[in-house]
Each structure stands twice: as structure tokens, then as C-alpha cells.
């Protein structure tokens, strides 16, 4: 956590905790100045212990506070400093705060509990709300982008109706598409399926469990890592009732800032000149030779898209009850026309003490309603459609021009003549009851019950009058329902005996999931008004009416335990184990063990480090843990039957069924064994601090669909465990107070991570599977090409591009190098000459956050990027130059001196481009106002933020930030795209007493 943002957070905290009761008090007045080694500390919190009565220091570090009596205890704190406590009558006039190395007393959530940061032995990164990314976020994971070394978050789209992010911790750990690479999300103790229903303004912290020793306590769901989200709650219990109101909101303007690389209308009509006579465009003109220039992208997009968001919270506390109730509203326009998302999120969190402290209760309830209006045009068609094609044609019944001979429909017509939207609701609730067993000091027993429920409803309609005849007059609707229930019982015990501290937790967990969906389609409606409202009134007697439904469920049950021990906060050890069963696995392998152990040694606590002022903190960590990967869907281990069509029998059609999946009673979870070695450090009076981690992973029993003989099998493929994959990496996070002079402070925080993986075994001959390689990364564009571009092969990593090694173009002929060093051309190139020609995985990823503060002004600049990866520019390959251009063309390979015709016959590294980039992802400037003690306003901050303002890259496509987290097609920039945008946002945060 950087120090300046910590000061800003402390300023907010100090202003928020000031109580309205302050004016009515006639107690004891304390005043003074708070300094550190460099001078006044701005934004330190001065708080009467046990209350919300407080003040914050001003520009000169000064404060005045009226407390209840001379005997009251007063805490002086600021994030990044050690807290000091004084009796009011003994509070000095000048208080000097000492910086707290890496905020060692900060609490880190580790799953089924929490620890002080200095006691953590696993690889865990904690990000507090004050350090989140600013700006418009379609998903809470965007708050973490670039903040945590080893956490790879890819922004895949600017469409507000999509989450827009793919998340991966420490690279690939599976080859199973169904299981995916996303981490497990825990929200306030509940494992959830969706975090997009959380208002970013209501998140207090996000803790990332990266290594196996930290994640093993989550068993079969811990392989991809865990992100624990803690939402905001009411203030601490206080004797005097306190209430405050908070508001945060912003308005944002978005504009296109990406270019796909296709010819503009002006370039298209001049292609013959620009290409040196090699490319002749087809100009669509009337009988008089007149033609129009149509910028199809402009026709489908807004000049400016507007988003506004508002969050109101009421926070209260008393001696036995506290609460936080919040309502958030957001309306986000997409840069595409007719594209919008609207959502309302409500949440209440409450805590209660009862039975003289024996019983503690926590209640959480949240609800979201949303509506997505989807874009029904097609940006790929807009990009490749001939720019001299008119939009309208008065001779057509619906007034739109029908493109001829291109296999492309009119994208403006589709946008205006079609509609598609989704709306839905989401509920999550939980209650936790904790009984403090007072006869046994440090022992408490908790019961936790939670539910999660979501329903989504989809509607779409294509109008009857449509030049795209195949899509005319059709409608559909579908619904899906998801429900899960969770029950947990835990016992916690914590005691300190002299220099020995012992903490343990043991528990049982049961979670059940239910999924239900249905859909129906029809066409041929009597009027346009019926569509999906009266879908049964379509042409049901003919062949188009289609209905389907499904219902599945699965269950997880587990017992778990963990023991933490430390001696004198120097020697640390943690051990955990989970025994878990999943109904998704085969009957012979439903249960498994997931152990973990980790150690820590705080070197700076040793006697030989006394007097070594250059080192404020040195802690070595070492850990080992086993995690699993639950199957991504139900019923994968049992035999399945599917509809095989119909045949005529005895005067009617009869449905047939056939085997579509083999039974596998031995199907089990993938198992990951992970070793981690880490160092937490702070040097030079805590001016430099951070962490270094090295890890090695072994993933065993990889899942794969293997080809099997029929008979004895009834279906030609079998999902089984046979493969192996290893990965390793280095993660470095550094925070440094680069400048601290007078009112100026500059904190810089770079992070960098290196990750490699290699498939060590794709199959197992002893089990009847003898695979060494298989191709993936399939691409196909309107019949132009249809091939696989990647390979999964033993000895290579995921994302290996597989094709022909480009050598040269001579007299229009393409030449390639063979693996043996020979040369072939297009006519003689054979499958045997294909080889690994690149990789979609970057050599390293990085982020760099900078925060500058001067008095009440704060500014931050955040950069992030990747280096060393290849991107397949499919648009360049499929729609590059050709002798006769009936459709639009990609311009990179067109010059007057040398125009290269696209080689659509073969995949070659000519079409792989350097995907490295650095982005100026976020720039924020803010100002925090000071208010007098008796002001109604506690806090007011205004800010201006710019997002995605600059990208430095060699890539010729719209955006080099393509998906690199997919097992099967990482690094492929498909022609289907949504325009990238830059955002400018104005916002404010205000709270009232």
C-alpha cells in the first residue's frame, strides 16, 4: 500500500468518524500537532477510543478535539504509521509518529479467518479500498488490474453489457476448457458464482491467495487461486449512537480511441494509387457513375457515450448494534448505438451483540436488478463491408440497401431492425451466529448459513421485413435460474502463553448448487407486436419452433482445519488440511485430501539484527500446498444419451437416442502441488518495502477428452485424467517513498511477474491414451480459411502458435523454412513442415502506480503492460490485400513500393505480431476540502479521472490487449470486436454527520 494513498485514506477516515455529538459535549479539550521524522502529518486520525468521536489533522498537522473527560483514552493513527494511545490529560502537544513497516499490523483475510500481515506465511496480497483503481469499472476485478504481481487481468471489451475481464493467477494450471482458469471468489464468506452484482463503492478490501499453502483450505476449488472480497460494514460499536450519510458518484464520457486498421472510405476508393496499381477496388455506383462514401463504423457508434453512477450509504452504530445500508444505481451507455446497461444494487450489513457478549450476530443481504440492451449490429461486417456501399435503398420494402454477393448483410439495418435484451435479478443473503465460550478463554463456535439466487431472462426479435431473409421474423426467449445454499459450522481457538501464540480453526462445510434453464424460438408472426410476448402465435406447425430445457445440481461437502503458531512473532508455522467430496466426480474418486504447510522466519526479530537500522523488516516464507480443480460442469462422469434425430415408423416420426458420453467411474479432480518461497522486506526507515516470491507448480491428473476405440467404448471420446503440466515463476512488488519533503510526497509502486509453463505429459499409454500433441486455436472467416493455428504438445507451453516459418516473398511467391532447415514455397508446403513459430504468453507482465500529494491535492498515474508475446492478427490475414477488392481491405501491407497479397492458404508467422504494450491506464487528480469541526459536512473530495488514454505498441490492430488466458485460443485477435474507448470521468465523494 503506498504511503500517500494511505494518508489520503486516513484523511477520509478521520473526517468520517467525526460524530454529531461533538457539538453538544462540554467535556475535555485536547489539541496538538502530529509530526513524523520529516514534518507535519496531514490527515492523521485523532480518535476517542471506543467511540466515533474524532478529528483529522490539517495542513500543518494540527488538531483540536473535545472528548468526554480527562480520563478518556485518545488514539492517534495514520495508515502507514504505528498507532499511539494516550490518556486525554496526558496527551503531549507534539506527537511524533513512527512509520510502521509494511503496515505489519494490517489484517489480511486468509480464508476462514484472518491474520496480521507480519504473521502471514503464505503468498497473499491484500489491496484496500483506498488503493483500488479509479474510473469506470464493469466488474469489481477491474479494481485490482495491475495492482498484484502474478494476477493477470485482461480487459477484453468495452461493451458495458459484458464483464469485460478475464482473470488468471500465476498462469495456466489446467487444459480443461470447462474448468477454466478463473479464481474462486469469496464474498463475505460465501463462495459465489458471480461478483458483478457488487457495487465497487461497497468493497472494503480484496485479498488474493496466490499459492497452494494459502488456497489449499478451499480444496477442489483452490487450484486457480482465491480472491476474497470483504464489503464495507457499519462502524465499530460505540456507547453513543452515531449516524452518518455517504454519497459517491461520477459522470463519465467515453470516446472511441482504437483503429482496426482497415481502409477508410477515402483510402478505399484510392486503393489502386496507394497500392502501386496492385489492388483494384470495386466501386458501387449508380447508372451515372455516382457513388457514396459510407463510414460504417461511424454509422454504428455514438460520438460520446455517457455513464453515470451513484451510491448512497447510511452508516450507524451503538453499543450493541451497527449497520451499513447502501443503494447504488448505474446507467452505462456503450459506444455502440442501442447498447446500454442499467443496474440497481441494494445492500445491508448489520452486526449485533447479545446475551452480555456471549452471542454475536452478523446479517448480510444484497439484491441487484439489471437490464442489458445488446448491440444487434455487427462491427466485423461494418469493418469489411465495401465503403462505397450505400446504407439506404428506397426501392426496398424496408428502405435499406441489400449488399450483393459478399455474404454480408447491412449492419445498420440489423442494428435498427433487431432487438435483444436481458434482464435479471440476483439475491445473496447470509447470517452468522458466534457464541463466545467464556469459560474457555479464546474459544468461540460459529454457525454460518447463506444462499445465492439468480434469475436471468433473455429476449430477442428480428423484424419481419428484413433484407437478411434468413433472419427475418424470428423471435426467442429464454430463462435460467441458479440457486445455491451453504451451511458451515466452525470452532475457533486463540491463546497467547508468554511468547507462544496459538490459533486454530476447525469446521464443516456443505454447499449445494441448482441450475435450471429453458428456451423457445419461433417465427412467422401475424404482426410485429407479438414477437417474444406471444411466441406461441408464430408458425408453430412448421419446422422452426424449437424448445429446450435442462436442470442439474451438484454438491460439495468438506471438513477442514488449520493451526497457526508463532514464537515471539519470529518463528511462524501454519498447517491446514481439507477433506472434500464432490458429486461431480466418478463413484470411485468423489473424495480427496488437500493438505498444506508453510513456515515463516522474521529475521529482523533476531538479536543479531538489533541496531541494523537499514533493515526494518525481513521475513522469509516457505510453503507447500495441494489444491484441486473441480469440474466445470455436471454429469461429466456418467453415461449420457442425446437426441439422435427422427425416423418414420408406423405412420409417425419417432425420436431416436444414442450414447453421447462414456461413463468414467474413475474421473477425479486435477491435483496441483505448489511450492512457494518468499521474502517480505522493508529498508531504509521503511522508505522501500515489498515482497518477492518464487514458485513451482506441478499439475497432475490433467483432464482431457481422449479418443477411444468403439467398441469396447460406446462413444469415441472419454474424459479422463492422464496429463501433467509444470509451471514456475517469479513475482516482485516494490513500494518506495521516492520524495518526502515538506508538503510534497511521491510514492511509486512497480510490480512485475514472470511465468512459464510446459506440458510434460499429454497422455498416459498405460491407461490406453497415447497422445503427444493436438492442435487448437481454430480460425475460420467466411470460407476464406479454416485451420488450427496452435498446438498443445509435450515440451511446449500453452499458447504455442503452429504454422509455417516465413522466409521471404519473391515474384509473388511465398517461401518458408522447414524444421530441417530447407526451403519450400506455398505449392510444396506440407503438414510435416509446420512448426512452433511463436507463443501467446508474455515473457512478463507489469504495473506501475505513482501517487503524488501536495497539501490537499492528490494525483496518481498508473501504467501497466506486457512484454514478449505474439498476437495473431486475424483481420490482417483474412482481409489483407488482394488483386480485386470487392470488400474492404486491411491497410498494413499496402504501400506504393511494396504491396503484399494476403496468403490465405497457409498460416505463417508473417501474420504474428509483437503484442507487447504499455498503457497509461489511469490518471486521476483530486482535491480534498477541509471543514470546520462544527460543519454539517464531514468530508468532500472531487476528482477528475482519465482511463485508457494512451497505448504504446507495435501492434497494427485495434488493441494488443487480447485474451491470453484461454487454453485453446490465447493470443488470437479475432475479427469479431467491439470498439475500444477512452473515458474521462468527474466524480465526488461526500459524507455528512
Task: Give residue spans per PLM region.
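Short, small/polar-rich motifs associated with maturation and membrane association
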Residues: 1-348, 353-354, 359-362, 368, ...
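Catalytic-site beta-strand/loop segments enriched in glycine and acidic/polar residues
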Residues: 184-187, 572-581, 818-841, 902
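Conserved small-residue
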Residues: 244-292, 519, 720, 737-840, ...
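Glycine-rich, aromatic-lined ligand/substrate-binding cores of catalytic
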Residues: 839-871
Amino acid at each position: 500500500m503506498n504511503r500517500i494513498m494511505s494518508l489520503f485514506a486516513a484523511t477520509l477516515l478521520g473526517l468520517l468518524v467525526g460524530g454529531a455529538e461533538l457539538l453538544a459535549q462540554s467535556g475535555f479539550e485536547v489539541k496538538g500537532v502530529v509530526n513524523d521524522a520529516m514534518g507535519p502529518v496531514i490527515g492523521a486520525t485523532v480518535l476517542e477510543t471506543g467511540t466515533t468521536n474524532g478529528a483529522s489533522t490539517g495542513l500543518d498537522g494540527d488538531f483540536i478535539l473535545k472528548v468526554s473527560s480527562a480520563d478518556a483514552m485518545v488514539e492517534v493513527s495514520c495508515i502507514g504509521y504505528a498507532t499511539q494511545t494516550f490518556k486525554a490529560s496526558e496527551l503531549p502537544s507534539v506527537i511524533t509518529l513512527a512509520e510502521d513497516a509494511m503496515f505489519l499490523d494490517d489484517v489480511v483475510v486468509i480464508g476462514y479467518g484472518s491474520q496480521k500481515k507480519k504473521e502471514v506465511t503464505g503468498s497473499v496480497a491484500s489491496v484496500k479500498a483506498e488503493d483500488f483503481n479509479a474510473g469506470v469499472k464493469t466488474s469489481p476485478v477491474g479494481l485490482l488490474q495491475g495492482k498484484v504481481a502474478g494476477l493477470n487481468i485482461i480487459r477484453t471489451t468495452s461493451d458495458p453489457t459484458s464483464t469485460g475481464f478475464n482473470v488468471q493467477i500465476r498462469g495456466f494450471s489446467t487444459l480443461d476448457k470447462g474448468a477454466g482458469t478463473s479464481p474462486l471468489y469469496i464474498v463475505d464468506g460465501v463462495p459465489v458464482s458471480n461478483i458483478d452484482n457488487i457495487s465497487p463503492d461497497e468493497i472494503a478490501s480484496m485479498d488474493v491467495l496466490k499459492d497452494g499453502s494459502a488456497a489449499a483450505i478451499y480444496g477442489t476449488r483452490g487450484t486457480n487461486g482465491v480472491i476474497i472480497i470483504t464489503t464495507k460494514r457499519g462502524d465499530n460499536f460505540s456507547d453513543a449512537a452515531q449516524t452518518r450519510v455517504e454519497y459517491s458518484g461520477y459522470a463519465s464520457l467515453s470516446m472511441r480511441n482504437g483503429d482496426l486498421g482497415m481502409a477508410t472510405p477515402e483510402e478505399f476508393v484510392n486503393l489502386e494509387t496507394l497500392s502501386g496499381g496492385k489492388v483494384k477496388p470495386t466501386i458501387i455506383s449508380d447508372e451515372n457513375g455516382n457513388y457514396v462514401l459510407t463510414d460504417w463504423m461511424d454509422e454504428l457508434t455514438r460520438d460520446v457515450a455517457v455513464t453515470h453512477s451513484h451510491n448512497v450509504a447510511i452508516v450507524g452504530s451503538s453499543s450493541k448494534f451497527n449497520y451499513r445500508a447502501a443503494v447504488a444505481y448505474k446507467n452505462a451507455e456503450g459506444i455502440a448505438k442501442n447498447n446500454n446497461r442499467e443496474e440497481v444494487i441494494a445492500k445491508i450489513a448489520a452486526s449485533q451483540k447479545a446475551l452480555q457478549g456471549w452471542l454475536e450476530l452478523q446479517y448480510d443481504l444484497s439484491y441487484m436488478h439489471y437490464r442489458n440492451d445488446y448491440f444487434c449490429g455487427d462491427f466485423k461486417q461494418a469493418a469489411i463491408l465495401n465503403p462505397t456501399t450505400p446504407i439506404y435503398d428506397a426501392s426496398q420494402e424496408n428502405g435499406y440497401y441489400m449488399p450483393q454477393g459478399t455474404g454480408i448483410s447491412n449492419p445498420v439495418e440489423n442494428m435498427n431492425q433487431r432487438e435483444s435484451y436481458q434482464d435479471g435479478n440476483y439475491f445473496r443473503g447470509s447470517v452468522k451466529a458466534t457464541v463466545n465460550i467464556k469459560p474457555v478463554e479464546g474459544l468461540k463456535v460459529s454457525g454460518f448459513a447463506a444462499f445465492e439466487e439468480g434469475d436471468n431472462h433473455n429476449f430477442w426479435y428480428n423484424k419481419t421485413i428484413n433484407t437478411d431473409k434468413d433472419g427475418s421474423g424470428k423471435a426467442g426467449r429464454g430463462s435460467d435460474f441458479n440457486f445455491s445454499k451453504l451451511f458451515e459450522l466452525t470452532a475457533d481457538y486463540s491463546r497467547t502463553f508468554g511468547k507462544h501464540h496459538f490459533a486454530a480453526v476447525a469446521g464443516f462445510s456443505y454447499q449445494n448448487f441448482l441450475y435450471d434453464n429453458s428456451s423457445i424460438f419461433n417465427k412467422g408472426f401475424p404482426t410485429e407486436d407479438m414477437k417474444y410476448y406471444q411466441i406461441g402465435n408464430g408458425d408453430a406447425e412448421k419446422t422452426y419452433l424449437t424448445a429446450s430445457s435442462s436442470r442439474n445440481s451438484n454438491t460439495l461437502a468438506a471438513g477442514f482445519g488449520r493451526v497457526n503458531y508463532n514464537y515471539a512473532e519470529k518463528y511462524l508455522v501454519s498447517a491446514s488440511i481439507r477433506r472434500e467430496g464432490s458429486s461431480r466426480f466418478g463413484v470411485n474418486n468423489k473424495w480427496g485430501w488437500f493438505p498444506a504447510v508453510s513456515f515463516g522466519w522474521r529475521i529482523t526479530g533476531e538479536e543479531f539484527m538489533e541496531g541494523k537500522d537499514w533493515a526494518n523488516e525481513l521475513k522469509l516464507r516457505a510453503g507447500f500446498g495441494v489444491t484441486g480443480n473441480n469440474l466445470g460442469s455436471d454429469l461429466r462422469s456418467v453415461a449420457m444419451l442425446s437426441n439422435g434425430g427422427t425416423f418414420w415408423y408406423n405412420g409417425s416420426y419417432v425420436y431416436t437416442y444414442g450414447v453421447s458420453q462414456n461413463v468414467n467411474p474413475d474421473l477425479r479432480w486435477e491435483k496441483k502441488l505448489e511450492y512457494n518461497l518468499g521474502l517480505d522486506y522493508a529498508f531504509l526507515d521503511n522508505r522501500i518495502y515489498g515482497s518477492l516470491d518464487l514458485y513451482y507448480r506441478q499439475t497432475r491428473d490433467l483432464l482431457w477428452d481422449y479418443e477411444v476405440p468403439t467398441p469396447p467404448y460406446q462413444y469415441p471420446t472419454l474424459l479422463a485424467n492422464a496429463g501433467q503440466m509444470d509451471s514456475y515463476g517469479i513475482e516482485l512488488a516494490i513500494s518506495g517513498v521516492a520524495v518526502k519533503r515538506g508538503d510534497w510526497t511521491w510514492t511509486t509502486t512497480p510490480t512485475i511477474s514472470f511465468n512459464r509453463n510446459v506440458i510434460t505429459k499429454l497422455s498416459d499409454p498405460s491407461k490406453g491414451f497415447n497422445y503427444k500433441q493436438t492442435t487448437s486455436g481454430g480460425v475460420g472467416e467466411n470460407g476464406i480459411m479454416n485451420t488450427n493455428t496452435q498446438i498443445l504438445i509435450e515440451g511446449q507451453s500453452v499458447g504455442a502458435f503452429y504454422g509455417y516459418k516465413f522466409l521471404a516473398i519473391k515474384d509473388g511467391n511465398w517461401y518458408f523454412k522447414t524444421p530441417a532447415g530447407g526451403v519450400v514455397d506455398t505449392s510444396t508446403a506440407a503438414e510435416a513442415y509446420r512448426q512452433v513459430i511463436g507463443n501467446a504468453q508474455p515473457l512478463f507482465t507489469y504495473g506501475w502506480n505513482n501517487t503524488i500529494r501536495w497539501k490537499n491535492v492528490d494525483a496518481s498515474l498508473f501504467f501497466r503492460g506486457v512484454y514478449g508475446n505474439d498476437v495473431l492478427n486475424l483481420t490482417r490475414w483474412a482481409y489483407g490485400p488482394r488483386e480485386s477488392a470487392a470488400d474492404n481491405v486491411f491497410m498494413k501491407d499496402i504501400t506504393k513500393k511494396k504491396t503484399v497479397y494476403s496468403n490465405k492458404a497457409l498460416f505463417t508467422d508473417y501474420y504474428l505480431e509483437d503484442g507487447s504494450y504499455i498503457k497509461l491506464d489511469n490518471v486521476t487528480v483530486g482535491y480534498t476540502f477541509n471543514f470546520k469541526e462544527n460543519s454539517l459536512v464531514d468530508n468532500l473530495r472531487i476528482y477528475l479521472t482519465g482511463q485508457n488514454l494512451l497505448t504504446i505498441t507495435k501492434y497494427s490492430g485495434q488493441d494488443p490487449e487480447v485474451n491470453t488466458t484461454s487454453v485453446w485460443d490465447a493470443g488470437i485477435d479475432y475479427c469479431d470486436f467491439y470498439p475500444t474507448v477512452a473515458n474521462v470521468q468527474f466524480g465526488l465523494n461526500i459524507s455528512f454527520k
